[in-house]
């Protein structure tokens, strides 16, 4: 069963719990600056989660000279093969959404990898603005999904 990561911006309260969960899940000691999901804060308790779209035809993967970005057949995520990456940052420049990040501390590329099929940000979202749902349910409005889960 193929899963879809979905963001409902109407529900985001910009609490930052997803950023912290991501940072801890990826070993950056909870430093929000090292997260793969970022909240664009539009006001108090109003935000837009920004995360890799795992594009069908990803510009980041197309431009990579070493094919270091490949689709994970299980999760559908565009994964980084670190052994192939030459740190040219062409993928960072190519992403039209700004979701490929350069980590100055660790000198590596960062992007959402869906945590190997179990995105750690999702269960920490108190308003269910982030969801990881089966593809066939992805077109359904979030409200019925939440009621079904309760």
Regions inferred by a protein language model and the residue ranges of each:
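Flanking helices and flexible, charged tails adjoining ferredoxin-like Fe-S electron-transfer domains
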Residues: 2-8, 23-24, 28, 34-71, ...
């Amino acid at each position: 069963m193929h899963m879809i990561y979905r963001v409902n911006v109407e529900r985001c309260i910009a609490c930052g719990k997803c950023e912290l969960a991501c940072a801890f899940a990826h070993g950056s000691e909870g430093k929000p600056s090292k997260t793969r999901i970022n909240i664009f804060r539009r006001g108090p308790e109003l935000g837009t989660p920004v995360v890799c779209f795992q594009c069908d035809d990803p510009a980041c993967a197309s431009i990579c000279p070493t094919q270091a970005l490949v689709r994970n057949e299980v999760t559908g995520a565009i994964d980084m093969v670190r052994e192939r990456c030459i740190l040219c940052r062409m993928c960072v420049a190519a992403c039209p959404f700004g979701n490929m990040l350069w980590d100055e501390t660790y000198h590596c590329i960062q992007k959402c990898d869906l945590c190997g099929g179990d995105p750690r940000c999702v269960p920490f979202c108190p308003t269910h603005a982030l969801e990881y749902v089966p593809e066939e349910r992805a077109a359904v409005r979030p409200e019925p999904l939440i009621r079904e889960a309760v």
